[in-house]
Regions:
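Acidic-and-aromatic substrate-binding clefts and catalytic sites of carbohydrate-active enzymes
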Residues: 11-18, 40-48, 70-78, 101-107, ...
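A general structural detector for well-ordered alpha-helical segments in enzyme core domains, enriched
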Residues: 21-26, 49-56, 80-87, 110-114, ...
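Active-site gating/metal-coordination segments in enzymes
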Residues: 48-124, 171-173
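Catalytic pocket-lining loop regions of alpha/beta-barrel enzymes
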Residues: 105-198
């Protein structure tokens, strides 16, 4: 079994990626299930997001793990968050992206509110990590240490040294391999942290960076890379999904 823990549908800079397009690309590449958030959220298109998730669930059933991408505007608008929570989508995680929405970095009360949503739903929190200072994995140390009742996933695991330091300090931290250099994955494995690694691809964002490679081939390449590094233990990465354990229906 292979679970892709980092997938998107919706509007992005290169156009629209429909639930059907993404689902069939993943299935054609041999993926068995996927945790997915909608990039349409960044345009605050809440009804579109709900339709996308419902369509994914209609196609993929219990192999879909919907991730609710929170934005500062969503949190502040009186109707938006209640609409998402009452949408009858069974959210399996929440996502917060300091890079796409820098307000998170300087609004601690808003962050606390967002984490409260995760606690209400009893689901993990996916945090984007990246090369911008406000997205460095180490920046989230306080949030993670002060919320040890939540599970956190550091998307991309950047910078890898900071991600590893957090994993070693906090038992509630994982990383996904979306756009992760294989040298970083090798670093994690050398540190004996294979049980903290989730397979992820960031499909369909690959279409922006790898224009000459179709999505199915891109996914297969990622699977092959992980398999070559993980060897006989690669299944520990492929099978791992922290979003499966949510038991709250909205």
């Amino acid at each position: 079994m292979i679970i892709d823990n980092h997938v998107h549908v919706g509007w992005f800079t290169d156009g629209y990626h429909s639930p059907r397009e993404v689902w069939y690309s993943e299935m054609a590449a041999g993926i068995d299930g996927m945790a997915v958030s909608s990039t349409s959220t960044c345009a605050e298109l809440y009804k579109v997001v709900v339709r996308e998730m419902r369509e994914l669930i209609r196609i993929g059933g219990n192999r879909i793990y919907p991730i609710l991408w929170l934005t500062p505007k969503m949190m502040k608008r009186r109707y938006a968050l209640p609409f998402m929570l009452r949408s009858k989508v069974r959210w399996r995680g929440i996502k917060m992206h300091w890079g796409a929405h820098p307000e998170w970095a300087h609004n601690a009360k808003l962050v606390e509110w967002g984490l409260g949503v995760a606690k209400q739903l009893k689901v993990p929190v996916l945090l984007h990590t990246g090369n911008n200072d406000n997205c460095h994995a180490g920046k989230f140390a306080g949030i993670i240490q002060n919320n040890n009742d939540l599970t956190f996933v550091l998307a991309h695991g950047r910078p890898i040294e900071e991600a590893i330091e957090l994993i070693n300090k906090c038992s509630n931290v994982f990383v996904d391999t979306a756009f992760m250099p294989m040298s970083d994955l090798n670093y994690l494995l050398d540190e004996g942290l294979i049980d903290k690694v989730l397979f992820g691809t960031d499909v369909p964002i690959n279409r922006v960076y790898y224009k000459d490679l179709d999505t199915v081939s891109y996914i297969k390449n990622q699977v092959d890379n992980v398999r070559s590094l993980g060897g006989c233990n690669a299944s520990l990465i492929f099978n791992h999904c922290v979003y499966q354990s949510s038991n709250i229906s909205n």
